[in-house]
């Protein structure tokens, strides 16, 4: 379950609770929950609905041709999300226009975000910054990577390391949609060294083509970095070798994932294997992939069946992040070997759904 190591042995869980209609529930207390680690009851040490811990956010945007028709809507919606999550300009102290919302909380010192786009390469467009202007500039300028080196590989269901070798000019070079590599690199290289509350927001069709990392590698990296992953699935159309794809469907909403209804030369690495990799007979089921990424990391899954509802989805993500509970506990057993520990958080209220991570990795003791 979603964790950040605040102290050597203290575990922190960001927790979202929703009712049967998918509405956020924000009036619960520690007494409403039961917590276990590896099947053993644990004592909740602290429980709060808001925190001064800084937010570290990462926007990961699929710029492959399969989702190209939604790019303009995605730029605008992601820009508004940046204003919601970083509402105070660091230079002037003035709020962004339209940045207030029912769920918004005061910004903690140190709140910052970065932007990555991925297609046949993974490219860091803007490193961690608290500047809305820098993020808006890169979002507005964001385009698919030049196709000079593109060699669209087969869809990757996460079972093996498929794709083409080498590192790209702005990141990894290879197939057509390096989703797993983007998650891995964002988690391992950017998020892992940071403290505070950490979340990735991913916009994609979920069909990986060409990544070196597997689906489990990507999720494992997010777990090790204590990162929640929120996913936005937009189907688009299958990529074609001659031109851009067509449209994707009509209005949609939320579901699955536990929710009712430049950096060239980034290194690779291995990961764990704690779950299956869903695929349909026709190939990878991108929707199931995006649902699994969200559910296994304590985030939420959303489906944008219509590009015009991206604003609504980003607003829901912002509210979920700002209104989540933060729970801490000290495990009853000490693990100095860096093992994975399964965490289960439940509430006695049967009409509510608790959303948090599957578990956490214990810190390895210094030799």
Where do the protein language model's features map onto the residues?
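Scaffold/interface architecture of coatomer-like assemblies
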Residues: 1-367
């Amino acid at each position: 379950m979603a964790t950040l190591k605040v102290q050597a042995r203290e575990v922190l869980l960001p927790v979202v609770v929703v009712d049967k209609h998918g509405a956020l529930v924000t009036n619960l207390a520690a007494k409403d929950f039961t917590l276990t680690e590896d099947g053993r009851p644990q004592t909740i040490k602290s429980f709060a609905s808001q925190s001064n811990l800084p937010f570290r956010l990462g926007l990961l945007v699929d710029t492959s041709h399969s989702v190209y028709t939604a790019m303009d809507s995605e730029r605008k919606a992601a820009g508004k999300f940046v204003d919601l999550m970083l509402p105070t300009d660091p230079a002037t102290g003035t709020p962004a226009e339209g940045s207030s919302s029912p769920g918004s909380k005061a910004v903690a010192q140190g709140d910052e975000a970065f932007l990555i786009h991925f297609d046949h390469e993974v490219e860091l467009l803007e490193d961690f910054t608290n500047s809305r202007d820098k993020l808006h500039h890169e979002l507005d300028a964001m385009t698919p990577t030049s196709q000079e080196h593109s060699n669209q590989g087969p869809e990757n269901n996460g079972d093996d390391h498929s794709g083409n070798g080498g590192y790209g000019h702005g990141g990894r070079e290879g197939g057509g949609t390096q989703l797993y590599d983007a998650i891995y690199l964002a988690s391992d290289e950017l998020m892992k060294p940071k403290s505070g509350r950490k979340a990735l927001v991913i916009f994609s069709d979920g069909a990986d083509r060409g990544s070196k990392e597997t689906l489990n590698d990507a999720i494992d990296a997010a777990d090790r970095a204590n990162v929640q992953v929120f996913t936005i699935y937009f189907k688009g159309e299958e990529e074609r070798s001659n031109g851009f794809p067509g449209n994707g469907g009509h209005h949609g909403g939320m579901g699955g994932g536990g929710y009712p209804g430049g950096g060239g030369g980034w290194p690779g690495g291995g990961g764990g294997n704690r779950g299956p990799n869903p695929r349909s007979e026709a190939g990878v089921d991108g929707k199931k992939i995006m649902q699994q990424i969200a559910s296994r990391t304590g985030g939420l899954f959303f489906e944008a069946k219509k590009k015009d509802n991206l604003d609504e989805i980003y607003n829901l993500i912002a509210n979920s992040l700002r209104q989540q509970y933060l729970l801490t506990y000290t495990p009853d057993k000490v693990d100095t070997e860096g093992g994975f520990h399964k965490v289960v958080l439940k509430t006695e209220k049967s009409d509510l759904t608790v959303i948090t991570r599957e578990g956490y990795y214990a810190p390895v003791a210094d030799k």
